[in-house]
From Swiss-Prot:
2,4-dihydroxypteridine 2 binds at C47, L48, T49, D62, V63, M64, A65, E66, T67, G101, H102, V103, K136. It comes from the Bacteria. This is Riboflavin synthase. GO terms for molecular function: riboflavin synthase activity. It is an enzyme of class 2 (transferase). Keywords: Repeat, Riboflavin biosynthesis, Transferase.
Length: 201
């Protein structure tokens, strides 16, 4: 489990093609400080398992074909910047919300509206996740726990989030251009509520 509070921006330093998979090498000195083989690290909101911890704060992780296709990890190349977070420790503060590290879909940044102190980012989303997104609710965008500040009024095919300076500075979303594909994970509580309501008839 993760919290959506990004610990650092890492950098992809290598990508090796495997059979139906890829092995990524990522530099992240903070998240690798106490990491070992088998630990979980969220990369752009995708839970990956550490294969090896390398010198200079690097680690390797394998990404299967389904994940490469369903998330933006398939677009990563050496030099790409990524959001990194270690799995939450029992008893640690839950600064964001419960994040599983299982991407539900990808969205696309369609507009950025900066102001003096914050910036509103509009993201187009597929219908498969739209029903779980509510105004003032939580959503994970590339591993970042954010609050939905606006929704499309009619078709509900987009939502907006507001970025404070700290989020812009410490995450990749601060520099992501219009047209960038981002990973989306909706609040898992909404999924459970829907399942319970369906079961109740």
């Amino acid at each position: 489990m993760f919290t959506g509070i990004v610990e650092e921006r890492g950098e992809v330093t290598g990508r090796e093609a495997l059979v139906d998979a890829a092995r990524l090498t990522i530099r992240g000195p903070m998240v690798t400080a106490d990491a070992g083989h088998g630990d979980s690290i969220a990369v752009n909101g995708v839970c990956l398992t550490v294969v090896d911890v390398l010198p200079d704060g690097q680690f390797t992780a394998d990404v299967m074909a389904e994940t490469l296709n369903r998330s933006n990890l398939g677009e990563l190349r050496p030099g790409s910047r990524v959001n990194l977070e270690r799995a939450a420790a029992l008893g640690s503060r839950l600064g964001g919300h419960i994040v599983q590290g299982h991407v539900d879909a990808t969205g696309e940044i369609v507009a950025r509206c900066p102001s003096e102190h914050w910036e509103v980012v509009r993201i187009e989303m597929p219908a498969s996740v739209a029903r779980y997104v509510v105004e003032k609710g939580s959503i994970t965008v590339d591993g970042i726990s954010l609050t939905v500040s606006g929704l499309g009024a009619e078709q509900r095919d987009w939502f907006e989030v507001s970025l404070i300076p700290t989020t812009r500075e410490l995450t990749t979303l601060g520099s992501a251009a219009v047209g960038t594909r981002v990973n989306l994970e909706v609040d898992v509580v909404a999924k459970y509520v829907e399942r319970l309501m369906r079961s109740a008839g």
